[in-house]
Design a protein with these regions (language model features):
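Glycine-rich, low-complexity segments
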Residues: 38, 42-67, 245
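GGW-centered surface loops in extracellular recognition modules
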Residues: 55-155, 160-162
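Short aromatic-cysteine micro-motif
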Residues: 141, 145-149, 177-313, 318, ...
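Beta-strand-rich, repetitive solenoid scaffolds
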Residues: 25-31, 35-39, 394-399, 410, ...
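C-terminal, surface-exposed recognition/capping segments
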Residues: 61-63, 69-80, 375, 392, ...
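Carbohydrate-recognition beta-sandwich/jelly-roll modules
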Residues: 97, 101, 136-139, 146-192, ...
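Extracellular "spike/adhesin" assembly and maturation modules
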Residues: 1-48
Length: 447
């Protein structure tokens, strides 16, 4: 059968008729259309000629990747085999995947295949909960990762799960093969109908130039609680919230099936070992760098986000309070990028930062007669730190250092802090020890 979806497109009537009157030749056309994927100029021309609205254009491109195949993985129960490694199933058998870096494009056989294929777009969610594409990467010159909310669009997953005494199978496809194959949660509308594609924000939320929560590259991710995130996102519209449980579930499936493991940190660790604070060992003025000991500098990474400043309060023991929650730790350089790390002398290393040309001093200050050294503090990575990764998955320099975020099929994650689920609450009942989690499928109803 043909997997090319022409619904809503503007083909001439003869080409449309092939889908029902001559499916064999329709498949020939499908194969030709799939060749467009590797020809940017031809793809741009075809999209603008064959599809009308931006949503239709996006679906046109995604459907070029549609293959109807089944990609699966089996994990043994612990009492069968206490291993995090999985066994590939169905069409995933024989496939391989490895994460890339900024300098190495690794082999990932899942790239561009069915549910693993993604399309970067600018867009928004309207008041009815429907995603509206504004610009498409490599199609529209207006597309921007820094000006407009950036998302990754995927074909809707249909999921098959099987549990038995040996373990569990998880299989996904872009086609529903039987009633046992259920649509992913992201794709289910409140009325029960199924969306043809799902949108996942590419970046953690940070403020744009107007102070609006945005999925854009090059900003500092904001620190939110469940409630403060909901309040902030409601300024964008009633259908916005932080990352949902369904978002997380979808990306977890992609990780487990593509890499056939539940030990995700063995593949891409993410930023979970990045909590350093070091005092200046050499004082300078009018600089955009801080000099620290050589051994301490070895723990830092070019591209990482840091703040530089001095304590403005003392702790209960009368010592400088270097808690990152205090503003003084960010006064000289606030969540800026490390641009270079180079030797200063035999014992010390200079760590350069991009502070926008604003120079500072690394001399100590005083609080109530107590000397407060200038310190550099690691912070969650700014968004867009993985923009130069050469593949669909991977970290900038090292995938397993524990100091860097990564992208997983286009979505940047694990930037160095916890991320509460934006549509999930746990209710603790009065006069009871019971707790119940609740997931909301329509953000407009979140309180």
């Amino acid at each position: 059968m043909s997997y090319f979806d022409i619904s809503g497109a503007t083909f001439n009537e003869q080409l449309k008729a092939l889908e029902t009157s001559d499916p064999c030749h329709a498949d020939v056309f499908n194969a030709l259309f799939r060749q467009l994927i590797n020809n940017d100029v031809a793809l741009k021309e075809a999209v603008t000629n064959f599809a009308g609205s931006k949503n239709e254009q996006a679906l046109f491109i995604l459907n070029l990747h549609k293959d109807g195949k089944k990609y699966g993985v089996h994990f043994d129960n612990y009492d069968v085999t206490p291993s995090s490694k999985g066994t590939r199933l169905f069409d995933a058998v024989g496939m391989t995947a490895a994460p890339s870096t900024n300098t190495v494009r690794a082999v990932n056989d899942f790239d561009g295949k069915g549910c693993f294929a993604y399309l970067e777009v600018n867009g928004s969610v309207d008041e009815s909960g429907e995603f509206q594409v504004q610009y498409i990467k490599d199609i529209d010159n207006e597309f921007s990762r820094t000006k407009y909310d950036t998302w990754c669009l995927y074909l809707t997953q249909y999921v098959y799960r099987k549990f038995d005494s040996n373990g569990e199978d998880t299989v996904i496809s872009d086609a529903r093969h039987s009633a046992e194959w259920l649509p992913e949660g992201c794709a289910i509308r409140p009325d029960g109908t199924i969306r043809p594609f799902v949108a996942i924000a590419k970046y953690m939320s940070g403020d744009n130039a107007d102070g609006i929560a945005s999925s854009i590259s090059g900003v500092s991710p904001k620190n939110y609680s469940f409630q403060s995130a909901l309040t902030k996102f409601r300024t964008k519209g009633t259908q916005y919230c932080a990352e949902t449980s369904q978002d997380s579930e979808r990306m977890t499936r992609l990780m487990e099936i593509a890499f056939a493991t539940r030990n995700s940190q063995a593949v891409m660790s993410g930023c979970n070992n990045w909590w350093y604070q070091y005092a200046a060992t050499v004082q300078e003025t009018d600089v955009e760098r801080i000099i620290i000991s050589k051994s301490n500098a070895n723990n830092l990474v070019v591209g990482g986000t840091v703040s530089i400043g001095n304590a403005t309060a003392l702790d209960s023991n009368g010592k400088p309070n270097n808690d990152r929650g205090y503003g003084g730790l960010h006064t000289k350089a606030n969540k800026v990028r490390i641009t270079k790390i180079e030797a200063y002398d035999d014992n010390n290393t200079a760590v350069y930062v991009d502070n926008g040309g604003q120079k500072f001093s690394t001399s100590p200050t005083t609080v109530s007669g107590v000397t407060c050294d200038t310190v550099i503090s690691t912070m969650p990575w700014n968004t867009g730190s993985c923009d130069d990764v050469l593949g669909s998955c991977g970290s900038p320099i090292s995938n397993t250092s524990g100091k860097e975020p990564y992208i997983l099929f286009g979505v940047e994650m694990s930037s160095g802090f916890w991320e509460p689920k934006g549509n999930t609450k746990q209710i603790v009942w009065l006069f009871s020890t019971g707790k119940e989690p609740y997931i909301c499928y329509a953000s407009v109803y979140l309180l």
